[in-house]
Amino acid sequence: MDKNIDFRMRVLVADDFATMRKIVRNILKQIGFDNIVEAEDGQAALQVLKNENIGLVVTDWNMPNMNGLELLEKIRTDPKTAKLPVLMVTAEGLKENVVAAVKAGVNNYVVKPFTAEVLQEKIEQIFKKLAG
């Protein structure tokens, strides 16, 4: 695993499906993250971001109340969270969706279904790039 990653950081997993949150949580634990918090939609994720020190956000695109793209836009416009790494994990694999997420400032993008190895690699890519 990448030496650029501090596994003590708190990771926020935002997805409206509890099963998907559990899958992502289990993969994150396999990778080495133990400090994981969950949110069922973008609004709940914003509350977590307001109250907790988060080091990485893993978010779905399609969620009620506030989708992952709207969450990403709010993260990028708040000076407190503007530089926070965000990984979008979603079924939205159409080129225009990927482009919209990139334009909004996503750090990396994973299309469902995915493997633990793909999620790990995408996270490693984020932190390698951030390390320069």
Identify the residue ranges that each predicted region occupies.
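Two-component/phosphorelay signaling modules centered on CheY-like receiver
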Residues: 18-37
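Alpha4 helix (beta4-alpha4-beta5 surface) of REC/receiver domains from two-component response regulators
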Residues: 25-26, 70, 93-108
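Helix N-cap/capping motif at the beta->alpha junctions
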Residues: 38-47, 68
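Short amphipathic alpha-helix used as the core "switch/output" element in two-component signaling
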Residues: 47, 69-82
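Active-site beta3 strand of CheY-like receiver
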Residues: 52-58
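Receiver (REC) domain active-site loop signature in two-component systems and cognate sites
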Residues: 63
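C-terminal output helix
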Residues: 114-123
